[in-house]
């Protein structure tokens, strides 16, 4: 298991490196007038919305209202809290809205975002899985259970007890969540296109704002 995790992390690192070489110019910004930075959302979606509204980044309808402002999300959208999907959906919607107004949304990857991509789910909550439950096929879930059950052929545990263990280990929505974070799927593809480093040169300022997720 440890070796598998190491291989996954190395693979993810290689993917990020390739993406970085292709889009490095997008991650170095010069002459930015205003930056709003938010870090460690961790599924606290309502708090994110309240913060953005207080900063004038979005209006009461959660639409971009900050003109040429650059919003920087400093890593860790996911894990620990239940509403990370709502936060990702909001940020994905705000990206084109900000661009149309002359601003920009930047998402810098944090370790928890990378962990979800590579399948390290130690801090993922049942609520985060539940957000994907409506998209989880009963057939996919049952097939996964049958594979789990076949691996315990010599076990004398009753099937209903094994199913309870299975449901605890793989809560409703687990398999749809994993599918959505695959490299070619909605959230996996979106996150894989994000940098690990963002450098902003503020207008009229001699220094740099350098952000690591």
Predicted regions and their residues:
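N-terminal secretory signal peptides that target proteins for export/translocation
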Residues: 1-5
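Bacterial N-terminal signal peptides
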Residues: 8-18
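Feature recognizes metal-dependent phosphohydrolase scaffolds
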Residues: 22-213
